[in-house]
């Protein structure tokens, strides 16, 4: 059996290949000892690691794994997934939305890291808890899916009420900027969480398309574990990317790009 592991700050992503079949699974990083014990009880032909906690695993297992830089591993894995999913693009920006978000430019041969922001899944969970007292990520994102941002976020259409705006009316003028205009309203947890995810999605997209413009590409690829069970984040990112005139790509199993790429480096 061949195993690639991306041991991140929040999740451990695992790719297994055996008998020409591929399997994906995740474990919380807090359960890293469980992963170590599992590896020590497996017959492993190839083991390759990446991510911030790769060294922790390598130090406690009986095997001799190879360790790779996570940016290179993610880029390689993304190349494989893009090809398998029929996306033929030569150069692009990709945003890896994990606990935080890193941005990379791929020129058809090599990747280079071109930026990063602290908005990502960590912000969704942390700010989401402060707004709702919910700690479970799946419960939080499920609730947010039912939220309405209009009572909380100030949109361009709210400012230009009776006239045609010079830019699309659905653009956000100020995140959370409509709250003081609706103090007589009851702000539900669903609405607050939807707006929090909106902030994350719009910041990530704004950064990604700015870099795409700088590197003269229309293609922006989004991967990362923050999209897991988070259709709202995906919609915000894809819609805003299109609205700004760029082409978004959401990659199935993109969160496993690092683990898959490590396996093939």
Curated annotation (Swiss-Prot):
Its EC number(s): 2.7.1.33
Gene3D superfamilies: 3.30.420.40
Residues annotated for ATP binding in this entry: 6-13, 99, 121-125, 137, 225
Biological processes per GO annotation: coenzyme A biosynthetic process
GO molecular function: ATP binding; pantothenate kinase activity
Keywords per UniProt: ATP-binding, Coenzyme A biosynthesis, Cytoplasm, Kinase, Nucleotide-binding, Transferase
Quaternary assembly: Homodimer.
GO annotations of cellular component type: cytosol
Record SUPFAM superfamilies: Actin-like ATPase domain
Annotated active site: 70 (proton acceptor)
Function (record text): Catalyzes the phosphorylation of pantothenate (Pan), the first step in CoA biosynthesis.
Subcellular location field: Cytoplasm
Family matches, as Pfam families: Fumble
Pathways per UniProt: Cofactor biosynthesis; coenzyme A biosynthesis; CoA from (R)-pantothenate: step 1/5
Top-rank EC class of the record's enzyme: transferase
Highest taxon above the source species: Bacteria
Organism: Staphylococcus epidermidis (strain ATCC 12228 / FDA PCI 1200)
The reaction(s) this protein catalyses: (R)-pantothenate + ATP = (R)-4'-phosphopantothenate + ADP + H(+)
Name of this protein: Type II pantothenate kinase
InterPro entries cross-referenced by the UniProt entry: ATPase_NBD (IPR043129), Type_II_PanK (IPR004567), Type_II_PanK_bac (IPR011602)
Similarity comment: family membership: Belongs to the type II pantothenate kinase family.
């Amino acid at each position: 059996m061949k195993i690639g592991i991306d041991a991140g700050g929040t999740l451990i992503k695992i790719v297994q290949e055996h008998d020409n079949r591929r399997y994906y699974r995740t474990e919380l990083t807090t359960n890293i000892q469980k992963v170590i014990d599992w590896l020590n009880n497996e017959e492993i032909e190839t083991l390759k690691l990446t991510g911030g906690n790769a060294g922790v695993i390598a130090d406690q297992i009986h095997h001799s794994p190879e360790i790779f830089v996570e940016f290179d591993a993610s880029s390689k894995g993304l190349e494989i997934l893009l090809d398998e999913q029929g996306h033929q693009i030569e150069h692009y920006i990709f945003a890896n939305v994990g606990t935080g978000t890193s941005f990379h430019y791929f020129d058809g041969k090599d990747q280079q890291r071109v930026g990063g922001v602290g908005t990502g899944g960590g912000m969704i969970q942390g700010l989401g808890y402060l707004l709702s007292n919910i700690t479970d990520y799946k419960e939080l994102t499920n609730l947010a899916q039912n939220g309405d941002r209009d009572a909380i976020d100030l949109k361009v259409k709210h400012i230009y009420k009776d006239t045609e705006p010079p830019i699309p009316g659905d653009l956000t003028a100020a995140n959370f900027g409509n709250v003081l205009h609706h103090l007589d309203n009851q702000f539900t947890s669903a609405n607050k969480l939807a707006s929090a995810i909106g902030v994350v999605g719009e910041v990530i997209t704004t950064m990604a398309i700015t870099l795409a413009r700088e590197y003269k590409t229309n293609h922006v690829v989004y991967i990362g574990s923050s999209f897991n069970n988070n259709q709202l984040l995906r919609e915000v990112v894809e819609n805003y990317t299109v609205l700004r005139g760029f082409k978004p790509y959401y990659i199935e199993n993109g969160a496993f790009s690092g683990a898959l790429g490590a396996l093939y480096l």
